[in-house]
Amino acid sequence: MFELIFLGTSASVPSHDRNHPGLLVQAGGQRILVDCGEGIQRQLLASGAGFRRLDRILLTHGHLDHVLGIPGLFSTLRLRRSADVMSVHGSPGTIDVVIRMLAGLWGDGRAPIPLELVPLTPGQVLDAGAFTINCFAVRHRDTDSFGFEFVSPARRHLLPERLAALAVPDGPIRKTLADGYPVTLDDGRIVTPEDVLGTPGGGKKLVIVGDTETTDGLQAHVRGADLLVIEATFLQRDSATARDYGHLTAAEAAALAASGNVGQLVLNHISGRYPDEEILAEARSIFPATRIASDFDRLTV
């Protein structure tokens, strides 16, 4: 299960109601920040999530509206005397932006907190314990951008009726079966996992795409996602302008969701030039299971 807290949902210019981009994903005891726009500290506090115990930051790309919150966040963590190592993941170009930004404030090779900078490559898979994060390339103007597939595996659960029928006692022996290993009961009978486990279920797939100028190449990554979060900066009537600035229209985002058999579509990176109702109408005409993200929205998948 993944819990999402939308911290910033604006396009490059923030508004009264929308902060610069940032999204917190919580799952399996992990707290992962996707993008770190200006003002992210206050958004974390206002959301109730807080900014301590962040496990890592994933950056979709290095444009300033997605990374300018990093220095302030790191400075506050230093004041809080955080000893945890912060891992920041992004493309080589994005990591270079972070390095230069930190160097301008604290000097070459220095940072205010323990820091691990991790350049990403397309196809790289990050192990987050209870789930994995597949990193894939995204096209957005002059950047080497990334999208992220969060995948929790389907699991088989113990069937109470089978446990009772086979007289399997409570305790560690049941955990052994749940972990996939056979056990021997006190009376000598051998019980295997196949005897007491149900069919696989419960696996989830969350896909997050930041700024992108095309849906080409994204189909394989979004296919079958329970939830797709993706930008929709323009409407289709302004598709030429969308191309010029390297962004999608709401119609294009919806078409991608429809072709990928996505469960739910959440539109993000919202421009103040359009009423939300108009953006939503364009997308829902193609993919009805669409909503627009707002700051401090919480979703669970």
From Swiss-Prot:
> Which GO terms label this protein's molecular function in UniProt?
3'-tRNA processing endoribonuclease activity; zinc ion binding
The record's listing under CDD domains reads:
RNaseZ_ZiPD-like_MBL-fold
Show the SMART domains listed in the entry.
Lactamase_B
Which UniProt keywords are listed? Endonuclease, Hydrolase, Metal-binding, Nuclease, tRNA processing, Zinc
According to the record, cofactor stoichiometry and binding are noted as:
Binds 2 Zn(2+) ions.
Q: Does the keyword field hold Hydrolase?
A: yes
Active site feature? 65 (proton acceptor)
What cofactors does the UniProt entry give for this protein? Zn(2+)
Spell out the reaction equation it catalyses: Endonucleolytic cleavage of RNA, removing extra 3' nucleotides from tRNA precursor, generating 3' termini of tRNAs. A 3'-hydroxy group is left at the tRNA terminus and a 5'-phosphoryl group is left at the trailer molecule
InterPro entries per the UniProt record, alphabetical: Metallo-B-lactamas, RibonucZ/Hydroxyglut_hydro, RNase_Z/BN
**UniProt binding sites for Zn(2+) 1:** 61, 63, 140, 211
What positions does the entry give for Zn(2+) 2 binding? 65-66, 211, 269
Q: EC?
A: 3.1.26.11
Q: Which family does it belong to?
A: Belongs to the RNase Z family.
User: What function does the entry list?
Assistant: Zinc phosphodiesterase, which displays some tRNA 3'-processing endonuclease activity. Probably involved in tRNA maturation, by removing a 3'-trailer from precursor tRNA.
What does the subunit section of this Swiss-Prot or TrEMBL entry state?
Homodimer.
Q: What is this protein called?
A: Ribonuclease Z
Q: Which organism is it from?
A: Bradyrhizobium sp. (strain ORS 278)
Protein's gene: rnz
